[in-house]
Structures are given as C-alpha cells and as structure tokens.
Amino acid sequence: NLPHPETAYAEWLRVLAPKGILLNYDAEYAKDHHRQKLPAINAHADVSAELLNECHNIYHMLEISLFERPRWDLEILKALGSCSCSVDQSVGDRIYAEQDIFYIPVPMFCIKAVKN
C-alpha cells in the first residue's frame, strides 16, 4: 500500500511522456480481509495471525483505506488533469483464469490513464 497515493499518481503522470499509458492493476485486498473465507491452502496460510493483524492495522492507518476504489482513483486522475482514464473491473477474471493457492477472492481492477 502506498502512504500517499495521490502524490504517486501525480508523479507518475508528471514523468509519463505525452500519449504515454499508465496502467495500475490493483484490488482492495485488505479491505475486508478479516471477513474473507479463504481455503485452508492459500498464499497466506503460513503467515502468523500476529503478522496478519499488523498488516490489517497498517492498512487502516492509510488514508486510501477510507475510499471506494477504483472510483477514487478515477476521480484523482481526472482532478490531476492532462489525461483520459478508464477502469476495467473484469481484469481479475482474465488474470486469475486458474484459482491456485495465490488466488484471493477480491475483485481486481485495472486503471488506465493516457497522458494528453
């Protein structure tokens, strides 16, 4: 998680060449992590409860945890101007064609910003 995602977006757009494309593949993995029912064998199966709790606490300390994503991302990118943006909320189905131990049942999204 980024502590200052708005600043990150601004910097990424600043260094992007005109007509350059910014792709951000993300998901709100931690938002409802404590409520998710994961299979017994999963990518976090060997992570201690203490470490998972610490990650959860860090997530809730970050401002971005308060926002509805990817709507927030689009609003920020549009407010920063100089780009056209779109979101693909079905990208996770294509990335996770097979649900292996790394699969986390959280809808992924892809933000695409094209610099003017």
What residue spans do the PLM features occupy?
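A short His-aromatic
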Residues: N1-L2
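Solvent-exposed residues in well-ordered beta-strands and their adjoining turns
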Residues: V114-N116
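Short proline/glycine-enriched turn/loop segments at secondary-structure junctions
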Residues: A97-Y103
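A short glycine-rich, Lys/Arg-flanked "PGG" loop and its adjoining helix->strand segment in the class I
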Residues: E6-P18
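C-terminal alpha-helical "lid/dimerization" subdomain adjacent to the S-adenosyl-L-methionine
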Residues: Y25-A97
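Catalytic cores of large soluble enzymes that bind and process phosphate-bearing ligands
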Residues: E11, S65, V106
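Short hydrophobic/aromatic beta-strand or adjacent loop that forms the aromatic wall/cage
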Residues: I104-K112
